[in-house]
């Protein structure tokens, strides 16, 4: 299987604070990579560099056939093209409150990609059905639960037809009872062959869905491999310590 995403030597600092140190990994097309690690380990920053929401200071990131060397000057057009390769789902769903669910989902395709409105609407209805919210198309975000809003956020990211889906702790802000609905949608996407990178605290979910797990600590990829290795027989003491604390908190 060819790699859809390759990350080579990514570095990132905020002021004096170095957040990512020489981060490199590959994500084969049609696979799911889970990124785990303690708070402040750089997980979210890694994800944000993949969408250039945070621009890496150096390193090369390739998505599909578009390769960007962040040590060089990157022009705006290239950066925009790079950003459109991936769809991002945040911890909080960031929906536009004054727009209906349907309007939220068609906004990107119509405004950014200049797609015909009727085509975007048909696509949006199909995506809302996929995330189990077809009947909520004309409601406003405040009328939905947090979990439903998050699923609209997923539909909105899918609407731009990205090559790669990025999830930043998509369930961390949700009521525990609603977590399952969102995870089910992500699992369905995995079964449909979407290529995804998911930052998550849901270790059991990572075990079920991920093909590869990266353990990040202090901005370094300390360990990576299939979930059955990283999550059940980690080689690094730090990975073991982290997993013990998460799986047996008391």
Q: Residue locations for each model-derived region?
A:
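ABC family nucleotide-binding domain
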Residues: 3-227
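C-terminal boundary and immediately downstream tail of ABC-type ATPase nucleotide-binding domains
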Residues: 228-250
């Amino acid at each position: 299987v060819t790699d859809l995403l390759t990350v080579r030597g990514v570095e990132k600092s905020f002021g004096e604070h170095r957040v990512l140190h020489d981060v490199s990994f590959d994500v084969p097309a049609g696979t799911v990579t889970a990124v785990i690690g303690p708070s402040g380990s750089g997980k979210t920053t890694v994800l944000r560099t993949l969408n250039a929401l945070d621009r890496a200071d150096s390193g090369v990131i390739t998505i599909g056939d578009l390769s960007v060397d962040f040590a060089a000057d990157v022009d705006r057009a290239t950066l925009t093209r790079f950003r459109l390769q991936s769809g991002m789902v945040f911890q909080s769903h960031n929906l536009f409150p004054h727009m209906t669910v349907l309007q939220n989902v068609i906004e990107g395709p119509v405004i950014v990609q200049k797609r015909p409105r009727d085509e975007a609407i048909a696509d949006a209805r199909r995506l809302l059905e996929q995330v189990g919210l077809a009947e909520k198309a004309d409601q406003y975000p405040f009328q939905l639960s947090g979990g439903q809003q998050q699923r609209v956020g997923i539909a909105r990211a899918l609407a731009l037809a990205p090559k790669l889906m990025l999830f930043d702790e998509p369930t961390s802000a949700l009521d525990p009872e609603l977590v399952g609905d969102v995870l089910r949608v992500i699992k369905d996407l995995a079964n449909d062959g979407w290529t995804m990178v998911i930052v998550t605290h849901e270790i059991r979910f990572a075990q079920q869905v991920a093909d590869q797990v990266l353990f990040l600590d202090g901005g370094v990829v300390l360990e990576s491999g299939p979930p059955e290795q990283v999550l059940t027989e980690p080689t690094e003491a730090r990975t073991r310590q982290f997993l013990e604390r998460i799986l047996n908190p008391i």
